[in-house]
Amino acid sequence: MMHVRYILQTCLFLVISTMAVAQPVSGELIGADSVQKVMIIPFNQYNYFSDADNELAEKNEMSATDISTMFRYGLNYNISTRVIATDGAYNILTDTTVSSAKDLELIYASVTYQFEKPVDVTVPDTLTDRTIKQPDLFGMGEQEPVKEEKKKLIDVKKEDEEPKNEKYLNAHVTHPEIFPVLQQKYHTDIFLFINSFELVTNYNHCLDRSKNYFERKVVVHYSIYDANGKQLKGDAMTVTFSSQQTNVDEIIATQFPVIAEYLAGTVTHVAQTDAPDTSTKK
């Protein structure tokens, strides 16, 4: 497997080099004097995790593959719609050209994934010591022991206070030279990676015992980069709902806009923070 991956990485480097020769590459932000354009990169199907697909497939009379495809396109559509409202957006998933399909595969081939602590360019302390030792897609793995004084604070936490993510699945781009190439080709300044999609049922939290309804959540892991390959943000966004909601179209229509609205706002915030100061100094 390592030998095969080495060959793929070598081929990828050659392809990117060829693309770079075919057109000028600067890495300078195109959107410095205008609205920035965001490339939305959907999650790879290999990074789709769900413990509810069998149930949803039966309720919706479709295959599990159809369920994951609908969630993938539904999430991408919602995100692009919200991003367009504040920034420009390029949706590579719905671009039907042969070139864009190949470029999406190149992007996937240039990315590796690792669990890390959330990172935010607006919070400098998050840019160091980000590695997490326990990779666990469903958040059920072991965690580091909590010190006694911290444990007391956790016990008295308000019920309506959302817990912060301790880890998320980050996208590491092994060939950052692909960013300015894609920027020149698609005129995009910001790259929003949807790294993984999780649909998880919490069977320890029963919402209605008479009807056997449990808490269910969608977790979307994401990373945001600029055209220079600088990571601006990385975290996971979670929405929680009842397992009573089993209609796929309804889940997409009610839950995904919440995720999309958050991501669109996050992109705008970090992009503005990262934008160069073009004001004239006197």
Regions found by a protein language model. Give the residues of each.
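Bacterial Sec-dependent N-terminal signal peptides
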Residues: 1-30
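Detector for methionine-enriched segments
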Residues: 1-2, 19, 39, 62, ...
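N-terminal segment of the mature soluble domain
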Residues: 54-193
